[in-house]
Amino acid sequence: MMCGGTSATQPATAETQAIADKVKSQLEEKENKKFPVFKALEFKSQLVAGKNYFIKVQVDEDDFVHIRVFESLPHENKPVALTSYQTNKGRHDELTYF
């Protein structure tokens, strides 16, 4: 993966789920609702001055959200942050840069 470009879509890992879990409350606050399910299914990543993660998350049986999470460089010691998201996505919607 080159700096600035996004990786290929990959199946979510335990690390991806942990990153998604860290921003779940931020998304719930922005959407003003609780998600009964919050399961990371797949992701792309992008190297910047840190790393962006684009994660497809299942939030209900047939409801999906695409989230963009920023992870700063380790020496900055900052928490991961939800920087953008897209709602009303389906299981087969392609995960793209947003």
From Swiss-Prot:
Motif (Secondary area of contact): 46-50
One Pfam family matching this protein: Cystatin
N-acetylmethionine modified-residue sites: M1
Alphabetically ordered keywords of this record: Acetylation, Cytoplasm, Protease inhibitor, Thiol protease inhibitor
Record flagged with keyword Cytoplasm: yes
Primary location group: cytoplasm
Subcellular location: Cytoplasm
Annotated site (Reactive site): G4
GO molecular function: cysteine-type endopeptidase inhibitor activity
Xref: InterPro entries: Cystatin_dom, Cystatin_sf, Prot_inh_cystat_CS, Prot_inh_stefin
Quaternary structure annotation from Swiss-Prot or TrEMBL: Able to form dimers stabilized by noncovalent forces.
Biological role stated in the UniProt entry: This is an intracellular thiol proteinase inhibitor.
PANTHER family named in the record: CYSTATIN FAMILY MEMBER, CYSTATIN-B
Family affiliation: Belongs to the cystatin family.
Protein's UniProt name: Cystatin-B
Phylogenetic lineage: Eukaryota, Metazoa, Chordata, Craniata, Vertebrata
Encoding gene per record: CSTB
